[in-house]
Amino acid sequence: MTIEFNPSKRATLGVEWELQLVDRDSGHLRQDAQKLLEELPELSGAESNPPLRHELMQSTIEVVTGICETVDEVKEDLSATVARLTQAADGRGIELACAGTHPIDDWRDQEFAPSQRYSELIEQMQWLARRILTFGVHVHVGVTDRDKVIPIVNALSRYLPHFLALTASSPFWSGHDTGLASSRSIVFGALPTAGPPPRLAHWGAFEEYMDTLLRAGTITSIKEVWWDIRPHPEFGTVEIRMFDGIPTVREVGMAAALSQSLVQLFEQQLDRGYRLPSPSSWVVTDNKWRATRYGLDARIIIDERGSTVPLRDDLYELLHELRPIAERLGCAEDLDVVAEILHYGASYERQRAIIRQGGVLKDVVDALVKEFRAGAPAVGSSHGRTDPSRNGGPSHAGA
């Protein structure tokens, strides 16, 4: 089969941000997505790409940007839509928040959005779909030529653990500490067409693989392929779907800057005739697990021999490499948030710090709500990175 790719302008951006609807008093999720969307028809109407959309659960609303040239445009677009949504939510006693999972609520208590697509998904996947009470962020980055797409997807898979660890925000599942930095990656990754992208050779191999899945009845549309990093032919982008739910617009800007800078780097290298790195599938899968379990304290595999380095060190090196590109793109300050997170802690660390200092899970929910309203992480004595020896530690991560 032939799959048309609509080329983008170089490194344009689009972001999808899945938000939790939280009751202001109880901290539990509210099943009011349909009511809020009906209250804001100008933002959720019949146009093909409205900025507010349903997700699987009635406790979730997705905020979507238009096509943006810069990270600043992404943040402005998201903030404007969130401001309108916040107004409507305030009138119903609802707060907005974002994390990969809700720390307390159980998937069994959720209502599903009224959608034929979601009904078919639940019928097909059953328990796997019913328990997807998860929240993520997807970043689209434009690619100029279809023949560049698969090499860029393969190269980006080297940084899959970096994307996940920086945004890991789901240590709790149904009121319990899972011991993971990201339980969301396990829950969503259980779907048969989710997980790390397969290592393909070129666009023709991607077309052949999609044709095989369609012929086999595994999927009915290529939109049902939910890889952690995937081509999006209609939008002319590479879509990075590995990010856990991101609590603040400042950190969303970081994710967009990191994504845009990497894709721009790989485009430039391809233009100069370089061959991009393409790690083996076993390395990508193993590294994803390490980031899922240990977050920023993981040791990641860097070659086929199994050599490992601390993920934190690799991130600092990556920042140094990407800095000139980020400056040209105008997103250097957003990229610098990576260093801030390495200093004060990713969301999973900030959440656990609250419990470690005597708080309860309702306090974690309240902190997520406050961070979302502030637009930036709460940094202070009650937050910060955990001691690696207390959450698995690099020595175990590299075993």
From Swiss-Prot:
**Chemical reaction(s) catalysed:** L-cysteine + L-glutamate + ATP = gamma-L-glutamyl-L-cysteine + ADP + phosphate + H(+)
Cite the EC number: 6.3.2.2
**Keywords (A to Z) from UniProt:** ATP-binding, Ligase, Nucleotide-binding
One GO biological-process annotation of the entry reads: modified amino acid biosynthetic process
Q: Name one GO molecular function term.
A: glutamate-cysteine ligase activity
InterPro entries in the record, alphabetically?
GCL_type2/YbdK_subfam, GCS2, Gln_synth/guanido_kin_cat_dom, YbdK
Q: Where is this region: Disordered?
A: 377-399
Broadest EC class assigned to this enzyme:
ligase
Q: What does this protein do?
A: ATP-dependent carboxylate-amine ligase which exhibits weak glutamate--cysteine ligase activity.
Instruction: State the family it belongs to.
Output: Belongs to the glutamate--cysteine ligase type 2 family. YbdK subfamily.
Protein name, per record: Putative glutamate--cysteine ligase 2
